[in-house]
Amino acid sequence: MKKYRIIVFGCQMNEHDSEVLAGILESMGYCQAGNSEDPDIILINTCCVRKTAENKVFSLLGRLRRQKAQNPNLIIGVCGCMPQQEGMAERIKQLFPHVDLIFGTHNVHQLPELIGKVIEGQKQVLEIWPGYGGELREELPVKRKEGVRAWVTIMYGCNNFCTYCIVPYVRGREKSRSPEAVYEEVARLAGEGFKEVILLGQNVNSYGKDLGVKTDFASLLESLENIDGIDRIRYMTSHPRDFSLRLVEAIAASKKVCEHFHLPVQAGSNRILKKMNRGYTREEYVDLIRYIKSLIPHATVTTDIMVGFPGETDEDFNDTLDLVREIRFDSAYTFVYNIRPGTPAAEMPDQVAENVKKERIQALIKLQNKISLERNEEEVGQTQEVLVEGEKDRGSGFIYGRNRGNKTVIFSGDPSLVGKVVPVTVTGARLAHLTGILSYNYHQEGSR
């Protein structure tokens, strides 16, 4: 049997797209190659949000040159967001003639046809669709990893056009799946034994706007609440501008939607937020967080923060630090701005010097790490619901899972608890996780 290997860069959307690629390949008779096995086909699912990810892809393609020379029948494919960028597919063809297949984000369903062309002898098969205006394809197979959590894409694309972001150009405009299709998939996952679903989209808060029917993200969450077997519902990613008060209220009323709000703020300076085209002010963001906390005092709030956006001054950066102190995020994904060709920010004057970016990111990380540890320490003594996901290390006697705030909790327990929601009393706090003990009043036969 022929074997495949998929190498993934980037976000959860790419991870789930790779599950679809795997499903298609297995429907064609391929099986996944083990770590020590040589595959017959390698697909590299790429990301272009950061230059770092692109550099890693180029480095990998360079290393695969030797493997291709040793096995000329090996099929090497590049897919995902990178080839969707203007001129990138041709660049890959020229730099890496050993790449057999290049396709984008809109035509994954063509994979069998494209592989067939390679097998027939066509060189460097290229198929990039600049956009996709047709119906979403619901029939594609999915090969999910075993576990208790499953990703479910509810929409594709983004209409926001933040000035630094390449996503709308490579993922296209927003297009929502029907609520019926989402409901059916989640119900099927419940029947397969999954306990948690993570709803995916570049901006889930815009769900339904393009459907022409009276539905929105809050309504979708309310409908999924009724599916037996699913204990938890999460979602990503959200845009603060589109996060409605009704959505906050729906989450507060839900028993299954987790109280974790990931709301990328990006900057604390109104001047920079405007240049980024984020569509909200610092004050509006703070008001949203306050409303969330007023309804859900124990909510976990996390964020993304960028430093070094073009024109960012010391005063602008200090505004960001002040916001971090004010909100006290549970955690933050912090990163340095880098130029994405084709975006408005790439052409902006006053690009910030690299040494200044480095100083600022270090100061931000130091502050946020201090706050993150303090926020975790505040949870010591609490008894929390933890969905057990697996063993920490095989035979170690420790298992791990996530609480409703999406924080990892490590505690002593039997692997038979995987897939169950159990009460854990938090006894310790680290920067990246909590430690605890299984609550004394837990009875295995009563667990969910």
From Swiss-Prot:
| Needed co-factor(s) | [4Fe-4S] cluster
Q: Report the protein's function.
A: Catalyzes the methylthiolation of N6-(dimethylallyl)adenosine (i(6)A), leading to the formation of 2-methylthio-N6-(dimethylallyl)adenosine (ms(2)i(6)A) at position 37 in tRNAs that read codons beginning with uridine.
Superkingdom as given in the UniProt entry: Bacteria
Q: Which residues form a coiled coil?
A: none
Q: Which residues bind [4Fe-4S] cluster 1?
A: 11, 47, 81
Which residue ranges does the record assign to the Radical SAM core domain?
144-374
Q: What is this protein called?
A: tRNA-2-methylthio-N(6)-dimethylallyladenosine synthase
Localization, per the record, is:
Cytoplasm
- Can you tell me which residues bind [4Fe-4S] cluster 2? 158, 162, 165
What would you give as a GO molecular function for this chain, any one? metal ion binding
